[in-house]
C-alpha cells in the first residue's frame, strides 16, 4: 500500500504501523521524487553544517488553509520546530518548498517546485516499484530513495539491497559516490 496523504492523526499512523506487520506500507506526505531528494540533500547539509540557521518557506494556492504536510515532513526530517516554517498563499500555486540555510556570510537555498501534478504520479509509480521489492514493514520515500542518494547513513537500506540501476541512475549514483568521497575527506575520513 502506498499513501501520499499529507497528514494522518497519530492514531492512524499507529494503525498503519501495526498493519505493516502483515503487508508492505509506504507513507509519505509528499510522494514526488524531487522533494524527497531535496530532504535527503538538506539532511546531508545539516549534518555537515549543524550550526546554520534553517528556515522553511512553503507556497501553495490561495485557499489552502493549513501548513502543508510536506513542510511539516521537512521540518521533522531536519528536527526543526514548527516556528521555522513560513507559509505563503497566493493564486493557484501547486506547491513550492524552499529550505534556507543561513551561514554567517552566505546562504544556501534548496528549492523544489511542483509545476505539474504529474510529478506526484511519477513518485507514486516509483514508490510502488520499490515497495514490492521490500519485506513487510512501514517505509518512507527516504528509505526507497536512500540507495540512489547516499549509502553511508545507517537508517537507509544497505547498498547491497539496492535495486538494479538504469544507466541514468548509475550515472547519478557515481556522482553521488564522488560527492560522498568529498564529504568523507571533508569530515576527516578516508
Residue positions per predicted region:
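Long, low-complexity, intrinsically disordered segments
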Residues: 168-190
Amino acid at each position: 500500500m502506498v499513501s501520499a496523504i499529507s497528514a494522518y492523526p497519530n492514531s492512524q499512523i499507529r494503525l498503519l504501523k501495526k498493519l505493516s506487520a502483515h503487508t508492505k506500507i509506504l507513507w509519505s506526505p509528499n510522494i514526488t521524487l524531487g522533494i524527497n531528494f531535496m530532504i535527503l540533500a538538506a539532511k546531508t547539509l545539516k549534518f555537515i553544517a549543524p550550526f546554520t540557521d534553517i528556515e522553511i518557506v512553503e507556497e501553495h494556492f490561495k485557499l489552502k488553509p493549513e501548513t502543508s504536510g510536506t513542510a511539516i515532513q521537512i521540518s521533522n526530517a531536519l528536527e526543526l520546530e514548527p516556528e521555522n516554517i513560513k507559509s505563503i498563499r497566493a493564486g493557484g500555486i501547486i506547491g513550492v518548498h524552499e529550505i534556507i540555510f543561513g551561514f554567517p556570510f552566505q546562504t544556501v537555498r534548496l528549492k523544489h517546485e511542483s509545476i505539474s501534478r504529474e510529478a506526484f504520479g511519477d513518485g507514486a509509480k516509483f514508490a510502488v516499484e520499490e515497495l514490492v521489492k521490500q519485506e513487510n514493514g512501514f517505509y518512507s520515500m527516504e528509505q526507497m530513495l536512500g540507495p540512489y542518494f547516499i549509502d553511508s547513513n545507517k537508517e537507509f537500506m544497505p547498498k547491497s539491497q539496492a535495486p538494479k540501476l538504469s544507466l541514468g541512475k548509475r550515472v547519478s549514483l557515481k556522482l553521488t559516490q564522488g560527492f560522498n568521497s568529498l564529504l568523507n575527506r571533508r569530515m576527516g575520513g578516508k
